[in-house]
Amino acid sequence: MDYAKRIGQVGALAVVLGVGAAVTTHAIGSAAPTDPSSSSTDSPVDACSPLGGSASSLAAIPGASVPQVGVRQVDPGSIPDDLLNALIDFLAAVRNGLVPIIENRTPVANPQQVSVPEGGTVGPVRFDACDPDGNRMTFAVRERGAPGGPQHGIVTVDQRTASFIYTADPGFVGTDTFSVNVSDDTSLHVHGLAGYLGPFHGHDDVATVTVFVGNTPTDTISGDFSMLTYNIAGLPFPLSSAILPRFFYTKEIGKRLNAYYVANVQEDFAYHQFLIKKSKMPSQTPPEPPTLLWPIGVPFSDGLNTLSEFKVQRLDRQTWYECTSDNCLTLKGFTYSQMRLPGGDTVDVYNLHTNTGGGPTTNANLAQVANYIQQNSAGRAVIVTGDFNARYSDDQSALLQFAQVNGLTDAWVQVEHGPTTPPFAPTCMVGNECELLDKIFYRSGQGVTLQAVSYGNEAPKFFNSKGEPLSDHSPAVVGFHYVADNVAVR
């Protein structure tokens, strides 16, 4: 019996010595949407459970009792109990101290809904958030009128009590929303693989607080947001097509993106850390690891990322089946993710960068996206943005077929030209009349109704002080009005 006990203790020692668990990306879910394990429903209880799990039995390693020639065997019975237990306790303490540092988990923020009388104040209301590792959290809400901030009231955050007070504007009755960014960047720790390859990733989660002013919670929640798509010319300078040095101007692009609710960027290859340096957008997709290994990793990156005031989840990256010539030097493709609106329902968001040149290869890229949408977004609200490298006037253009087969509407066509697609729109860079290579398609779906209410070619807002563009593309923005089911009252 004593010998078996010693074997168990030695086995425990071996288990404790296995300090590292498999490194995982906690910044955002990366399972394919068809993977049953990648449910879009968050599980804050599981996410905030204590480190460790249920106790499991420990057994000796099979074959450990077989002597090896020339190797002295250690009799477990010769190891004093006190020494062995002290060693196990010491190594367990080391492990428990290291894991929260080298394998920290992202905090969890949950959506909230509160009611306040007309012209009244509610609070302090504690934020519904937790940190699985017990790290101190900070809370940030953007100023009134800013994207993601309250539009019809003032929010005051108390970091000490992890709570907020909301004061409604006089005379306003209706629904107001704001996003809260929850961060555990208050101590030295790393969030898995995302943290090792990008020190700014993995610390944050974001949730929406919905405020019903002068009324009770409703079955639906409506609001507005802006969606921008922008090819930021992020190849290493001077390979980039943009005429300006990329370090400084990529940082300037990131700063100016704060004026929008959601931004899908393409060619975010080599300067991602500069792009997010001045960003206030709390939900950001972690770049593919090679993007941080500039310039070696550039050929292995798709350059596609999303920055958002709404929570973005379930990221899936897909590369093109077909490419031609220099298009094959980088892993162009598309991303799929879900954007959570106030009320809890989600929109499927696609961000793409097709092959240049148009024709069969570009059309094959669009067919690949269409097939993916049909398999993974059936019946759901969808927004597709990106650098399509195609115009309606191009020979063999498949843009019309792409829209029709997926039930999508081109927001530029709808807002600027009514229901008719212009066959020969000007290809200028400045002006809403210009047909850009960069497009935004959308459709409504179960639980979410979308309507494009405005379109803008934002090129003048992305010039430097000399009137030079920060990229060789013009960013396009669409203002959306949404009506989403309130899942909290279903």
Swiss-Prot record:
Its main location: membrane. GO terms for biological process: acquisition of nutrients from host; hemolysis in another organism; monoatomic ion transport; sphingomyelin catabolic process; transmembrane transport. It is a multi-pass membrane protein. Disulfide bonds: none annotated. It comes from Mycobacterium tuberculosis (strain ATCC 25618 / H37Rv). Disruption phenotype: Cells lacking this gene do not grow on sphingomyelin as a sole carbon source anymore and replicate poorly in macrophages indicating that M.tuberculosis utilizes sphingomyelin during infection. Moreover, deletion of this gene reduces lysis of erythrocytes by twofold compared with wild-type. Residues 30-49 are annotated as: Disordered. Catalyzes the cleavage of sphingomyelin, a major lipid in eukaryotic cells, into ceramide and phosphocholine, which are then utilized by M.tuberculosis as carbon, nitrogen and phosphorus sources, respectively. Thus, enables M.tuberculosis to utilize sphingomyelin as a source of several essential nutrients for intracellular growth during infection. Furthermore, lyses erythrocytes and constitutes the main hemolytic factor of M.tuberculosis. Induction: Rv0888 protein levels are increased by 5-fold after contact with erythrocytes for 24 hours, and by 100-fold in the presence of sphingomyelin as the sole carbon source. The gene is spmT. Residues 1-31 form the signal peptide. This is Sphingomyelinase. It is found in: Cell outer membrane. The chain crosses the membrane at residues 137-145, 162-168, 172-182, 188-196, 205-213.
